[in-house]
């Protein structure tokens, strides 16, 4: 059966549901839904409340009083999402799909009857319309119109407009870094500067299905306005007639995974340096952007030419095999999953501190805290097994890792309202001056042996050995940037981090 798109709306990121900060937040609809697990793809009954602020929260049991409402298992927002109806993998299914940063995230639900599904769809649409009106009333004044031939969005004052429209022809395509359901990530070289970037290419149809028109690309704006020394910056974003393209920094000091593999284990001091930079970046995402990163793992950490951390945003939603009996029960990187993610208790910021615990354990112990080739056994270890440490590890490091790898997110270090501040105050980081971390005043413990931003010695040899072709043979699918009147869905999707290339 075809998916049917109902609505696309701007608003909050999916990752952090809005909370009851005002007394006039009302419940619009409540009832039982079956929610499909995000990783272990079984269906679980959940009692959901939809509120007029966009909050969509689920419980194992129907909450009887206000106290019980304070700790939902699932907590996210229906804002800025597509809502789709489908009859697969079960009848009366609906899917909420959202672009968080540049990664497409989905949640899947089903109900017993078409009428029930229609009721939920109508309720969600009602909430969406209210949020849309609110946003329109409070939205910053923007000059320029969708038909503006420059194709450039009015930027915040701090950002210069691009002097020319960026197109796909300005890059050499070197290596496929990742592929998934919604698109691909390619290592590219900008012809004019010789600099390397990661280009994430998303198929437009998965973000705007059928003839729905996107009100705005809020997440694109979030990315543009994110400025943090240890987060991958967005250099350009542009579109072709069927794709959205995000061009992001690709740090050339090599993946941390590469350096750790070579050295097997890092000293506690070196791990402390990298850990501090990661904490600084996650603190910014949580407190300034209200975003949970969700995907912290060694492969997503790179070093820049000076040896500072860069957290990447090259993630793609992994593809399942098939619906039905042959469907793999799991997709993603299982070794890094927090217990609450495995149990499908939709997670908050504490999931990032679990991820920090796993990567810092790898750095200081030279192996993963939990590992088994058999996924079922691995899940059991993550959920049940106590953490073990090598005898050589110092007491402060043990204390930090024990706190970060607590199974219960509410008991986890950083799991309380203080979030990152709790980790910053831990005795393992006692000598760290956090403002100095942010300002890159700490000297990196290892400096990559690269001479410039175009030095490729830490790249896989095959990265630079040959160019890859990404233009499909079909003329209709040309990768040329097309005129604004031919792309009504994303009339203002164009961005450059500076006026020059």
From Swiss-Prot:
The keyword Cytoplasm does not apply. InterPro entries: AGC-kinase_C, Akt1, Kinase-like_dom_sf, PH-like_dom_sf, PH_domain, PH_PKB, Pkinase_C, Prot_kinase_dom. The active site is at 295 (proton acceptor). Its EC number is 2.7.11.1. It is an enzyme of class 2 (transferase). GO terms for molecular function: ATP binding; protein serine kinase activity; protein serine/threonine kinase activity. It catalyses: L-seryl-[protein] + ATP = O-phospho-L-seryl-[protein] + ADP + H(+); L-threonyl-[protein] + ATP = O-phospho-L-threonyl-[protein] + ADP + H(+). Residues 135-158, 471-501 are annotated as: Disordered. Signal peptide: none annotated. Keywords: ATP-binding, Host-virus interaction, Kinase, Nucleotide-binding, Oncogene, Phosphoprotein, Serine/threonine-protein kinase, Transferase. The AGC-kinase C-terminal mediates interaction with THEM4. Belongs to the protein kinase superfamily. AGC Ser/Thr protein kinase family. RAC subfamily. This protein is synthesized as a Gag-Akt polyprotein. This is AKT kinase-transforming protein. It comes from AKT8 murine leukemia virus.
